Design a protein with these regions (language model features):
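Bacterial N-terminal signal peptides
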Residues: 16-26
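Carbohydrate-interacting regions of secretory-pathway proteins
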Residues: 29-240
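Cysteine-centered motifs
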Residues: 6-8
Length: 240
């Protein structure tokens, strides 16, 4: 099936204005450059149609369903046998992805794979935007290099423990940014990393849990720019 008409969880201009405003207020006193502003592109599309799992596959689909317009990963009251991944069928390179995530219990773990590939046995290899108590906003490399950058957004007061949290991933060449609830959590220059791959949703193995994902909106080859700064300042902001 082709791309679906996009239905954003939050209007893009409002979301990015909020991101830039909050970030500026937090860091302007120490002359920290602003994160990149990504324009709302006509090419934005929904990766999930809100009704079924068309264009998504998993080694074991019994863990995955659609409930009330969200993708749900769970085994009910049973423990989850190993990490489970639901893969979107296409590969992407440079992109901006926004989505909302809700997790019960809050102490559980999940994540969003990107620039990743499935491995034999059902595991994954590649970047992960982590989800879970003590892990939200962290950039992890699944079955590879481990933690690449810990979240700058610390403290549970920045998270909605009982509801939806907004996640954004921006990958442009070797540079990666993660945004959590409108605040930048990671900015990493990673020349060793993968430059393309697939997107997948994870429910972590172990304790019974339920993770929900909705509003998955993708823009490929987004337009990058700097609000109140320049390209040199952006590079200085990235972790080396």
């Amino acid at each position: 099936m082709g791309a679906f008409e996009c239905s954003c969880f939050m209007s893009k201009p409002f979301l990015f204005l909020t991101v830039l405003t909050v970030f500026f207020l937090s860091f302007s006193q120490v002359a920290t450059p602003l994160p990149p502003h990504i324009s709302c592109s006509p090419g934005e599309e929904a990766l999930f149609n809100g009704h079924d799992l068309s264009e998504w596959q998993a080694q074991d689909m019994s863990y995955w369903s659609v409930v009330d317009g969200a993708i749900v990963g769970t085994a009910g009251e049973k423990k989850i046998k190993g990490n489970q991944f639901l893969w979107h069928e296409r590969e992407v390179r440079d992109f901006h992805l926004s989505l909302a995530v809700r997790q019960v219990p809050f102490a559980a773990n999940a994540g969003i794979q990107f620039r990743s590939q499935p491995r034999a046995g059902g595991s994954a290899f590649g970047y992960q935007a982590d989800v879970g108590k003590g892990w939200w906003g962290t950039l992890y490399h699944e079955h590879g290099r481990g933690i690449l950058a810990k979240s700058r957004v610390t403290g549970e007061e920045h998270l909605n423990q009982e509801g939806w949290n907004q996640y954004e991933i921006l990958a442009m060449g070797p540079d990666i940014w993660l945004f959590l609830n409108g605040k930048i959590s990671v900015a990493l220059h990673d020349p060793e990393g993968e430059r393309s791959g697939r997107i997948a949703l994870q429910v972590h193995g172990g304790m019974p849990q339920r993770v929900e994902y909705k509003g998955l909106n993708l823009t490929e080859n987004p337009t990058g720019g700097i609000a109140g700064s320049n390209q040199n300042a952006l590079r200085e902001f990235l972790q080396k």
